[in-house]
From Swiss-Prot:
Record function comment: Catalyzes the irreversible transfer of a propylamine group from the amino donor S-adenosylmethioninamine (decarboxy-AdoMet) to putrescine (1,4-diaminobutane) to yield spermidine.
Biological process per Gene Ontology, one example term: spermidine biosynthetic process
Catalytic activity annotation: S-adenosyl 3-(methylsulfanyl)propylamine + putrescine = S-methyl-5'-thioadenosine + spermidine + H(+)
Entry keyword set: Cytoplasm, Polyamine biosynthesis, Spermidine biosynthesis, Transferase
Gene label: speE
Domain PABS: 5-238
Homology family: Belongs to the spermidine/spermine synthase family.
Protein name: Polyamine aminopropyltransferase
Length: 289
């Protein structure tokens, strides 16, 4: 029996995870980062940037549903959405399911990610790039939010980890820019790592977001692909009530949307804001594990 090639993630220095490679579909350096897309017998097609897994066909729906539907159903009347990053197309797919939206803008720094994910991960976008409401802008997200004249109801930062091209999307400059281009009652959410292993990211993000938003916090989802399992998402708004929309209201909005999900539902939405004590201790007492 021939031995399969092994691809190892390099996100953490002292531990990590590996994946067997059935077939490499694409591997090269784009203008900004190393991009590989390969097939795995269990997880389907996997895309990684600079040695860190970004998405897999098997469980991408969890990440994309929770980042898209939690803020959109909490808002309840969003018309304009901004996605920062998201070049694989999965976030766009989920956002496009909300038929009442009038405009969906995606700002992606790396055109290569969009091009090759459209070719090799077509199930992620599922045709969403052809939605007439969609506008793609190739630009740095920090620059865009600090220079645009547009306003948005929901901003979703579908960023990489705070290294390489994604580093700027965890800065005060970026958070301040998002605050300036959010409409009144708007919501900002962002990928914020696996808090058990990356607590410093959550603590730092919380401190920075608190400087620009009246209400900031986190919600979570269990996503097997990301080492450590429990992914944390940053949340920020000027209206604290948006983080506490009741179950009955969410259920009505979800029913009116007339689509189903594989992970998200209104009860999961409410429960996702219940945080483990170790994270609360890190955020509010400075005690870390």
């Amino acid at each position: 029996m021939s031995q399969k090639e092994i691809w190892s993630e390099t996100l953490h220095a002292n531990f990590g995870q590996y994946f067997s490679v059935d077939k490499v579909l694409y591997h090269d350096k784009t203008e900004h980062q190393d991009l590989i897309i390969f097939e795995n017998a269990t997880l389907g097609r996997i895309m990684a940037l600079d040695g860190t897994v970004q998405t897999t066909e098997r469980d991408e729906f969890i990440y994309h549903e929770m980042m898209a539907h939690v803020p959109l159903f909490a808002h309840g009347n969003a018309k304009r959405v901004l996605i920062i990053g998201g070049g694989d197309g999965g976030m766009l797919r989920e956002v496009c399911r909300h038929q009442y939206l009038e405009s969906i803008t995606m700002v992606e720094i790396d055109a290569g990610v969009v091009e090759f994910c459209r070719q090799y991960l077509p199930n992620h976008n599922a045709g969403a790039y052809d939605d007439p409401r969609f506008n793609l802008i190739i630009d740095d997200g920090v620059n865009f939010v600090n220079t645009t004249d547009q306003k948005f109801d929901v901003i979703i930062s579908d960023c990489t980890d705070p290294i390489g091209p994604g580093e700027g999307l965890f800065t005060s400059e970026f958070y301040q820019g998002c605050q300036r281009c959010l409409n009144e009652g708007g919501i900002f959410v962002a990928q914020n790592g696996v808090c058990f292993l990356q607590q410093d990211e959550a603590v730092t993000s919380h401190k920075k977001l608190s400087n620009y938003f009246a209400d900031s916090g986190f919600y979570q989802a269990a996503i097997p692909t990301y080492y450590g399992g429990i992914m944390t998402f940053a949340w920020a708004s000027q209206n604290p009530a948006l983080r506490h929309v009741d179950l009955a209201t969410l259920q009505q909005r979800f029913d009116n949307a007339s689509f189903t999900c594989r992970y998200y539902n209104p009860a999961v939405h409410v429960g996702s804001f219940a945080l483990p004590q170790y994270l609360l201790d890190a955020l509010f007492t400075g005690c870390t594990i």
